[in-house]
């Protein structure tokens, strides 16, 4: 009976700790090239970190993939890494310290301040692009292959990433803040790897959840009309 209680308590502790990680975190670092802003977003199973110039939005670095927590040890499996593609498919483990508003990576000596805990945005979690409409015709795409376009959202932050886990290729990323109010999804772009001049751009879309999928309609950062379909990543 005591062993059962201990096991239950350990499971409950791990679940509580994992739920505490979910959301968005940030830190700043002063380097020779200027002030860097670093943001990491955690959903229940997936995470992504972005690093960019805090003043200009110039993109610097990103990596991400899956994560799990065992006690205070976090293990991440890398799905993309803009600085070192050979890390794709590998796992890295490290000790963390967590409280309500601070996440510390012990060996790295880095401390992150909480931005949000996964609220209040309606779309928090990990999504994969699963289709789009072209000239009114719906086109679907597989989400179980190595080529992925993933969008990771906390309660207030978003990041999209296009990559291939098989070839280890990184195709692009962008991110910033978002809000969802009365069926309107608004983005404030803070970085965009393909074109740094997009930083500061504000975009507005209509959104609707249909059969569990996120329908995303409006105009792209290039001004082209779009209607994308995103499915929750499991």
Name what the model sees in each region.
Residues 175-181:
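Beta-propeller blade signature
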Residues 18-173, 184-234:
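Lipid interaction determinants
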Residues 1-24:
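Bacterial Sec-dependent N-terminal signal peptides
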